[in-house]
Amino acid sequence: VTAQWIDIPTGNDTFGGYLALPKRGKGPAVIIIQEIFGVNSHIRAVADQYAADGFVALAPDVFWRTQPRVELTYEGADRDKGIELMKKTDVGLAVADIGTAADALRARPEVAGKVAAIGYCFGGQLAYRAAAAAKVDAAVAYYGGGIQNALDLAGKITQPILFHYAENDHGIPLDAVEQVKAAFAGRQNASFHLYPGAEHGFNCTDRASYNQRASALAHGRTLTFLAEHV
């Protein structure tokens, strides 16, 4: 895997993104959308993992308009800072930035195939919104917070979309999961998986809530989903 930060032009400005390339050079593309903690070492590791799986992976800096290249840990003051940055983020502009990142990927010679978004936590909601805005060809939302408050967008999503939820997520109660499921009832493009005993952030090896079984299972399901749709 070859990885580096790149500049992505947007209007008269640029924002950063962490780009990880597969060893074979070419592949379909995934946009890895950060949590509230920035494109930190864990998100970069996720991009590297997908590059090792043969994808061109790009993790755009979602918070660049407020504070570029922020790198936060998961507790205390860093967590408070992440919540503050999320609240300052214009979701519409963030989705537009994801679209810009997708276009940047499509223009790269290494990208052969479609572009999917995989988002975690706040990034899961952004992946959902990016699909609704037709910015990506498929989307995966890991414990996407707030999706239940944006169900007016569900009807706009015609692309394949995969939802991973944790059974014991204090931020996303099971009734919220049921609301999202109900919005996609009878639709063939949406898949849902609930992970028993898992908590919010179960995919992150740097968090106390990391759950190896749920993480491995969700990663396998995501790879199968990507193999079918990108």
Map each language-model feature to its residues.
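N-terminal cap/leader regions of alpha/beta-hydrolase-fold enzymes
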Residues: 1-230
